[in-house]
């Protein structure tokens, strides 16, 4: 059994960092050591920022985004086309689409996907809030931007079924060949989706 070489406070820091997605025990040790070496430039400011985030971060009651205000900055942005809602699984998907900068629309975060095997049903997700938003009127298009997994497809079909009869156009993200992708390296499912989603040039 290895002997402890640091105090309990540093061990606790390492253990907590190791819980961050993408950081294992080794990476957490490196990150902790780096933070400690840069105590004034990184560790102190990071500690303060995390304390502020803990105190101020809220979940938007309208769309499910995380922000320090409710409703969130996206929902109150008058420069956005609020008649288009992009439905995403998680806040990280919202951020990814925003980085792409392809659309200036509103969002709705589901908080996951339907997964009966994991016990996740419609009531466990933010689907009712989406239906209520569309029921308020003023929404002309719903873009379902969930992952191309079985759970994502199931969720997309469920949402589409729930919105039958409402006057809203429902679209999905195209699936297929990524920009710069080579056909030889793509899996069969991706190639099949690309062929089905082909467009006229």
From Swiss-Prot:
Q: Does the UniProt entry include the keyword Metal-binding?
A: yes
Query: Pfam families recorded for this chain?
Result: RecR_C, RecR_HhH, RecR_ZnF, Toprim_4
Q: Which CDD domains match?
A: TOPRIM_recR
Query: Known Gene3D superfamilies for this protein?
Result: 3.40.1360.10, 6.10.250.240, RecR Domain 1 (1.10.8.420)
Residues spanning the membrane: none
Residues in C4-type zinc fingers = 60-75
What biological process terms from GO does the record include? DNA recombination; DNA repair
Q: Which PROSITE patterns match?
A: RECR (PS01300), TOPRIM (PS50880)
Query: Could you tell me one molecular function GO term of this UniProt entry?
Result: DNA binding
Give residue ranges for domain Toprim.
Answer: 83-178
Kindly indicate whether the keyword Metal-binding belongs to this entry: yes
Q: Which UniProt keywords apply?
A: DNA damage, DNA recombination, DNA repair, Metal-binding, Zinc, Zinc-finger
Q: Which PANTHER family match?
A: RECOMBINATION PROTEIN RECR (PTHR30446:SF0)
| Record-stated family | Belongs to the RecR family.
Q: What does this protein do?
A: May play a role in DNA repair. It seems to be involved in an RecBC-independent recombinational process of DNA repair. It may act with RecF and RecO.
Q: What's the protein called, per UniProt?
A: Recombination protein RecR
Q: Which organism is the protein's source?
A: Rhizobium leguminosarum bv. trifolii (strain WSM2304)
